[in-house]
């Protein structure tokens, strides 16, 4: 990623997983700022769950930063037998230990639960004491000073893995609620029903400021941003603050939704970034007033609307999907694959073309974003055939790895 490097914008190493069919999806570190008081901990290991295989790969990124190596594999069959959980998704460290949201039970049915690992990556058991009336799992984020965790909903692995069927939304097989937990007691205590405004409420983010109770959720199918906060009376409130309109398409029987599959907040809590995977745009909003976001930047790349079919000389298959921001808020790296079966359904050409990663240059002082013309990684050119890219992490820290106590 250094423009002065002779291998700028190139793949310099590939680490093959030992199994087949893992589908590496999200990932997270073994340590973050929440274990600042434990001198034995360092950000050395990256945990890569296989959402299909249920295997969790622990990768050593520190011994040789240019050639990460496999440290350990936590077997998915062992996880199932010890916890009755499958479908590993979001990884967060908790002090020196690790919590991973699991989207299903051993048979792939919802709601799943939370896997608890110790710092040696041994299975402790299930983290939660109860799932209450929660129907589905997906993402989670916590604010320890307020003793709160928020979790969101996708669907059961058996529902989302084969592909997306709109009728299953109507059959209530996809989520439309977010949940507030008593973090210390490890039990859900309040549910917010978002209804049509919150279909497929995927990523959830609190402000980085540990004193803040403001947080945000991107509802993928509704293409809305939901804002929540705790009011002066101590009650949790929510509102819809961003609504991306569906767009007409000549080949679609209905207007195309944006499919806002990810959101991100800059480290200073000033900007919120979101994607519209089917439309093909990335957006930047100033959220200095979290009740009234202001659109400050927009970049087009791929998507179904045909506004930017080619980026830096590479034909795009897919749209902006996952993204990660540098700590200084200036470099936003964006990838294009959502989930293999969903990719194949909406962007079938990705099978032959593979995914890409691009860099968007952001202006944290004045707002605004522009596509970097010098950087693109074309994973369609991989030696073992076209590959797809999902989540990115920065070894030195990024904007979704740390939770402050």
Regions found by a protein language model. Give the residues of each.
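Blade-level signature of beta-propeller repeat domains, shared across WD40, Kelch, NHL, RCC1
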Residues: 323-405
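Asp-box/WD-like beta-propeller blade repeats and closely related beta-sheet repeat scaffolds
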Residues: 61-144
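Structural signature of eukaryotic scaffold interfaces centered on beta-propeller domains
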Residues: 23-43, 84-94, 141-147, 203-211, ...
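Beta-propeller domains
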Residues: 1-41, 47-75, 109-110, 118-121, 130-137, 141-290
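Short, conserved, GDST-rich strand-edge loop motifs in beta-rich repeat architectures
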Residues: 38-44, 48, 101-110, 152-173, ...
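Surface-exposed loop and turn segments in beta-propeller and other repeat-based domains
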Residues: 12-29, 71-84, 127-135, 188-199, ...
């Amino acid at each position: 990623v250094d423009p002065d490097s002779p291998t700028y914008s190139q793949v310099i190493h590939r680490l093959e997983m030992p199994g087949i069919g893992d589908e590496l999806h999200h990932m997270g570190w073994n340590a973050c700022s929440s274990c600042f008081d434990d001198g034995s901990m360092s950000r050395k290991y990256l945990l890569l769950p296989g959402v299909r295989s249920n295997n969790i790969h622990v990768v050593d990124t520190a011994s040789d930063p240019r050639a990460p190596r496999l440290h350990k594999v936590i077997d998915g069959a062992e996880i199932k037998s010890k916890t009755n959980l499958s479908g590993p998704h979001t990884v967060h460290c908790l002090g020196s230990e690790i919590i991973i949201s699991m989207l299903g039970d051993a048979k792939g049915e919802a709601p799943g639960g939370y896997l608890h690992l110790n710092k040696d990556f041994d299975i402790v058991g299930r983290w939660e004491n109860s799932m209450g009336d929660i129907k589905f799992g997906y993402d989670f984020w916590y604010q320890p000073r307020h003793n709160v965790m928020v979790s969101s909903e996708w669907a059961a692995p058996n529902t989302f893995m084969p592909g997306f069927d709109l009728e299953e939304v109507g059959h209530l097989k996809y989520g439309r609620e977010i949940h507030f937990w008593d973090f210390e007691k490890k039990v859900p205590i309040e549910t917010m029903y978002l209804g049509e405004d919150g279909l497929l409420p995927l990523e959830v983010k609190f402000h980085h400021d540990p004193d803040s109770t403001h947080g945000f959720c991107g509802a993928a199918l509704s293409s809305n941003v939901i804002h929540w906060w705790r009011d002066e009376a101590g009650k949790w409130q929510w509102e819809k603050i961003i609504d991306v309109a569906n767009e007409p398409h000549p080949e679609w029987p209905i207007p195309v939704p944006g499919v806002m599959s990810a959101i991100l907040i800059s480290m200073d809590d000033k900007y919120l970034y979101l994607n519209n995977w089917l439309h093909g745009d990335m957006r930047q909003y100033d959220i200095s007033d979290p009740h009234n976001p202001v659109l400050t930047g927009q970049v087009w790349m791929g998507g179904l609307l045909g506004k930017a079919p080619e980026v830096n000389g590479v034909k795009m298959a897919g749209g902006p999907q996952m993204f990660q921001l540098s700590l200084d808020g200036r470099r936003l790296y964006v990838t294009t694959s959502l989930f293999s079966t969903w990719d194949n359904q909406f962007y079938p050409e990705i099978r032959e073309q593979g995914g890409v990663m691009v860099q968007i240059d952001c202006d944290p002082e004045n707002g605004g974003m522009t596509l970097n013309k010098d950087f693109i990684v074309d994973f369609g050119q991989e030696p073992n055939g076209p590959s797809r890219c999902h989540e990115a992490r920065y070894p030195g820290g990024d904007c979704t790895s740390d939770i402050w106590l």
